[in-house]
Amino acid sequence: DNSRLFAYLADGETVLRKHPNDKVVNVNHLGNKVVELGTTLGNLFDGDVPFEPGCRVVIPLRTSGGAVSVENCGECTLKDVHIYSSPGFGLYEQGGNGGNVYDGLRLIRRPNTNRLHASSADGFHSKGCKTGPRLINSELSYAEDDLFNVHGSLDYVYDVIGKNKLLVVGHYGISTDVGTSVDFYDLESYEYKDTATVTAVTKLSDTVYMNNIKDVSSFIGSEYGVTVRTMPDGTFDMYEVTLDRDVDILPYDWYIGTSTSSKNTVIKNTYFHDGPVRGILMRAPDSVIEDCTFENISCSAIFVCLSRYWYEGPIANNLTIKNNVFKNIVCGVPGSESSMA
């Protein structure tokens, strides 16, 4: 349910150029090998390549985790790891000091087979590390979602309980260590408001707070028109934060630190190809993308943004992108033919 739908020509080598967010909402088996698919957009027939008998269809059934998971680790090196199939992420990295090195990682369809996809989610997904990954001499392809996605979290102010004391909702921990700075941004406009230094952090366990957090997404959606997802149980905590000075902020303003932002991510000499969504989704500051090739990417080769909906950030400030090659990019929207990133 709610999985993306992908269509290939009969040879399995050419994905039909279409928007990748046409999702399957229901599947009805009509018998005699006939299946009726209900989708959100219904635009499978809008592309300039015909969808006809003989075409092959993929409906990934995504699960959590990855074929290879690296969690709460630091300065590990994975050399020449080849991943041919994963029910979730190809490689999943979360938490810890980070700075892990992936040299010669390949996410590809198993050679000499007729497989269509190599993973049912992002090819490489990294989040919440103190230092981001170093991906070198690698190849990522045929993932169901972004080929590479790296980010920290967007936390938010739950309440202002004193001139320099806040209650903060952290997503998978909190994005600031004691002694580091935090930036505040307006909930609606995302305009910068203030900066302060964190002097104390205390994790709270009040069940009333935890239950109230579940209602925040619907409240700010109705009151402010800002759409964010409901945080699933086990993915958030409440913190009391003390700052070094007063700040002029409001409840639900964004609380942005970089302690767990996967900063200093390095991506070099890597081949990104045949991605039905984006090549690199970059949200980690102080990062480098260099000497890479992007080919046959349905959406942007490199997409730099934050996501309020997914609570993913912070902002990829001080990002260096140089000496990369782009071939046949943004080819997944009907009627488009572009080599721009």
Language model features: what each stretch is:
Residues C73-T77, G95-V101, K130-R134, K263-V266, ...:
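Short "repeat-start/strand-capping" segments in structured domains, especially the N-termini
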Residues D1-Y84, E93, R109-H117, S141-K263:
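Extracellular polysaccharide-degrading/modifying enzymes targeting complex plant/algal/animal polysaccharides
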Residues H171, D253-T258, V277-R278, S307-P314:
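Short, contiguous acidic/charged loop-to-helix segments that flank catalytic cores in large enzymes
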Residues P285-S287, F294-Y309, A316-N324, S339:
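Active/binding-pocket-proximal capping segment
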Residues S64-A67, P87-E93, R110-D122, T131, ...:
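Short glycine/acidic-rich loop motifs that flank beta-strands on beta-rich extracellular proteins
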Residues V68-N72, D80, F89-G95, R134-E139, ...:
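Short, T/G/N/S-enriched strand-turn elements that build extracellular solenoid repeat scaffolds
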Residues G128-Y142, Y185:
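Repeat-solenoid scaffold signature
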